[in-house]
Amino acid sequence: MSSYIDKFQGRFIGVMQWEDCNALLENLINNPDDWYLYDTLTQAPTTTVTAEVFVENINKIKTVLTEEHQERYCGIVYTDDLKTPSFVKIFHPNNLGKTCGSSEHPPIPQWLLSKIPPEDVIEKFGPPEEEKGFVSKFLKL
C-alpha cells in the first residue's frame, strides 16, 4: 500500500469544537506553502497549489462549513496534528453518510489537504456498488 493511502487510513484527531476548527484553518492559512489540495469531486492533483490558491480555497471551505453545517459542534474536520498538520480531511456537510459512522461504505472526505502527493481515493474506496437486495446485503453476494 502507498504511503498516501496509509496516511489516509491512519490515525486522525477529530476537531469537535468550532474554536479548534477555526484555529486549525487559520494555522493552514498562515502556513500555505507546499500543500496538495485534493477536492475528491475532481482528479487527484499532481502538483502543489500556490499559497494564494491554497488560502483562497481554505476560505471557501471555511464558508461552506460555517454556512452549511448548522451544528453546535464541528466534527467533520480531521487532522493528523493540530499544531503542525501535514494531512487534513474535511467532509462536506451535505455528504456525511450515516450519522453513526458505522456504515459499510463510509463517506469520502470532499477535501484532502496533504504535504505528500495524493492518490485517487475515489478509485480506491469509491462509491459503493448498487445494493443487490435484502438477502445479498447480509450474505455479501
Tell where the protein language model's regions lie, with residue ranges:
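A contiguous binding-surface segment within folded domains or other stable secondary-structure elements
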Residues: Y36-E56
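Polybasic, proline/glycine-rich intrinsically disordered low-complexity segments
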Residues: I13, D20, I29, P85-L141
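Short, surface-exposed beta-edge/turn micro-motifs
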Residues: P32-W35, E71-G75
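Generic secondary-structure microfeatures
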Residues: L41, I58, D80-L82
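Short, well-ordered helical secondary-structure segments
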Residues: L41, P45, T63, K98-C100
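N-terminal "first-domain core" detector
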Residues: M1-Q43
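Canonical SH2 domain fold
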Residues: L65-T66, R72-D80, P85-P93, K98
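Short linear interaction motifs
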Residues: T50-Q70
